[in-house]
Regions:
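Short S/T/G/P-rich N-terminal loop/turn motif that feeds into the first structured element of a domain
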Residues: 1-85
Length: 85
């Protein structure tokens, strides 16, 4: 079964950075417990511009993890599926 992935972009003002990183830590713990992988990257040339990736081994696992997340994803229905090359 192909892996499933969601992507979320966020722009965080410097005054909110500490709260945002706390939120990310809670999400990382949640997704890890839900058998998902969670990565966050910040754009080098634009501090505060983040992109979050959440991946699972299948779409069902990912959908359930998003539905139960402590902080909601903006559009959890936009799921990307791994392409077998």
């Amino acid at each position: 079964m192909p892996k499933a992935l969601t992507i979320q972009r966020s722009t965080v003002p410097s005054a909110e950075r500490l709260n945002y990183t706390k939120r990310l830590k809670a999400l990382r713990s949640h997704y890890s417990a839900a058998n998902c992988r969670f990565w966050v990257f910040e754009e080098l040339s634009l501090p505060g511009a983040f992109i979050e990736f959440t991946e699972a081994d299948d779409e069902q696992t990912l959908s359930v993890a998003h539905a139960n997340a402590p902080h909601k994803t903006l559009d959890p229905s936009r799921v990307y599926q791994e392409v077998d090359l």
